[in-house]
């Protein structure tokens, strides 16, 4: 049985490869910004939005590929005041996001949804709490300049498995959720369905 990751995230693909899974990747091309805005307007939480985005990606690809299992994944970031940060569109916006997060805690929700024949068949959501240390403007400017090509694709402007680890004082949660997918529940499910080695 074929497994597809409906994501262009290098971090998510690397996690699946490191776990020894055979899979293909394809982009779902879901309008994440529009869907997020609609869900926020409807009063949905960042946790539920991550789940809905992951489901939209998985279902979109699975509806075109009968019998294929598709994994959609997405992450959302919420500050303690309830506001959400999206992927930065410019280096200046990335710097602004980092200034807003500096010296504060935020919560990261990473969801994975499996779909087959156009319908969701499994889901899991992981949560991590992360504390970014106080950051100087000079550090932020240098960090963004050196890492823009990779952080532009992340909701928190960091890849914790790389230079982003320099941002943090404290982290609660598993590393896979922070990178972008609740791997342990996903692997348990994939083994139960025969899509991962027992």
Swiss-Prot record:
A molecular function (GO) term: nucleoside triphosphate diphosphatase activity
Cofactor field: a divalent metal cation
Keyword Hydrolase part of the UniProt annotation: yes
Assigned EC number: 3.6.1.9
Residues forming the catalytic site: 74
CDD domains tied to this protein: Maf
Catalytic activity annotation: a ribonucleoside 5'-triphosphate + H2O = a ribonucleoside 5'-phosphate + diphosphate + H(+); a 2'-deoxyribonucleoside 5'-triphosphate + H2O = a 2'-deoxyribonucleoside 5'-phosphate + diphosphate + H(+)
Localisation: Cytoplasm
Enzyme class: hydrolase
Gene Ontology annotations for the cellular component aspect, listed alphabetically: cytoplasm
GO biological process: nucleotide metabolic process
Family: Belongs to the Maf family.
Protein name, as recorded: Nucleoside triphosphate pyrophosphatase
């Amino acid at each position: 049985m074929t497994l597809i990751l409906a994501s262009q995230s290098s971090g998510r693909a690397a996690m699946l490869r490191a776990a020894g899974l055979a899979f293909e990747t394809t982009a779902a091309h879901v309008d994440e910004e529009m869907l997020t805005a609609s869900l926020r307007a409807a009063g949905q939480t960042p946790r539920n939005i991550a789940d809905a985005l992951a489901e939209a990606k998985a279902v979109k690809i699975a509806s075109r590929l009968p019998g294929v299992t598709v994994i959609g994944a997405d992450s959302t970031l919420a500050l303690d005041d309830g506001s959400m940060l999206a992927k930065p569109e410019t280096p200046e916006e990335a710097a602004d996001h980092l200034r807003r997060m500096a010296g504060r805690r935020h919560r990261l929700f990473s969801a994975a949804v499996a779909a087959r024949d156009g319908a969701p068949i499994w889901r899991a959501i992981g949560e991590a709490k992360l504390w970014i240390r106080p950051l100087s403007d000079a550090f932020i400017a240098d960090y963004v300049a050196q890492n823009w090509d990779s952080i532009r694709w992340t909701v928190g402007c960091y890849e914790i498995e790389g230079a982003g680890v320099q941002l943090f004082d404290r982290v609660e949660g598993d590393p896979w959720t922070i990178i972008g997918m609740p791997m342990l529940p996903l692997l348990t499910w994939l083994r139960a369905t025969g899509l991962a080695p027992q």
